[in-house]
Amino acid sequence: MMSCGGKKPVSKKTTPCCTKMGMKRGPWTVEEDEILVSFIKKEGEGRWRSLPKRAGLLRCGKSCRLRWMNYLRPSVKRGGITSDEEDLILRLHRLLGNRWSLIAGRIPGRTDNEIKNYWNTHLRKKLLRQGIDPQTHKPLDANNIHKPEEEVSGGQKYPLEPISSSHTDDTTVNGGDGDSKNSINVFGGEHGYEDFGFCYDDKFSSFLNSLINDVGDPFGNIIPISQPLQMDDCKDGIVGASSSSLGHD
């Protein structure tokens, strides 16, 4: 209870860094890009919170980091996605779902943001035009689109179960003691922006490459994302990895 004559405590809310006094928002100018590139060439990447002040930019650290990572890095490719890259995106999406960071980690020079935008504006529509479900990568069955339940023998009806995000978000590797609490979520966070550092593990990388490079129809030879991945071949390598390689920044 609040004592007599006492003041109600004022709750402090954290405000986004871009709303601080004097911080610029909106599109970056050519001059700002040049300042950021010049500073990073001299001082290197990192320490993003203090970088704007050290570089003389009226931007927040997050804005500087995203501008560098998605646009200004020398290794970043912009536009002109090739047919080979498009085919690889389709294969990886069928295997990994909407895990754009993981997908970008397998396509040199492409950012997760660009791949996500290209998927939503081009590839998703392309699959729909071909009669392919962009989520499951299976043919759309026009006969079952409006059927809420499926008839089975004996007249009994069972509802069709929708594809749950748990099929794609929680692929785990058991630590060996049978305790699910010790399982590792090898695909990271729940928002689709995972750390893909573990992909550099040799065994897992070889395992993933063997699936990606499967020869044949890109819609027919890769494990559907509704089925759990069989991770036995690379389990030891992932479980043995350090916690730093599996964690998030």
Curated annotation (Swiss-Prot):
Q: Indicate the residues that the entry says bind DNA.
A: 48-72, 100-123
Question: Region Disordered: which residues?
Answer: 133-180
**Start and end residues of each HTH myb-type domain:** 20-72, 73-127
Compartment list: Nucleus
Q: Which GO terms describe its molecular function?
A: DNA binding; DNA-binding transcription factor activity
- Please give the tissue specificity annotation from the record for this chain: Siliques.
Concerning InterPro entries, the annotation shows: Homeodomain-like_sf (IPR009057), Myb_dom (IPR017930), Myb_TF_plants (IPR015495), SANT/Myb (IPR001005)
Do you know which Gene3D superfamilies this protein is assigned to? Homeodomain-like
Gene Ontology terms, cellular component aspect?
A: nucleus
Signal peptide residue numbers: none
**Recorded superkingdom:** Eukaryota
What SUPFAM superfamilies does the record point to? Homeodomain-like (SSF46689)
Output the PANTHER family linked to this UniProt entry.
F14D16.11-RELATED
Can you state the subunit structure given in the record?
Answer: Interacts with BHLH002/EGL3/MYC146, BHLH012/MYC1 and BHLH042/TT8.
* The name this protein goes by in its record: Transcription repressor MYB5
Q: Which gene encodes it?
A: MYB5
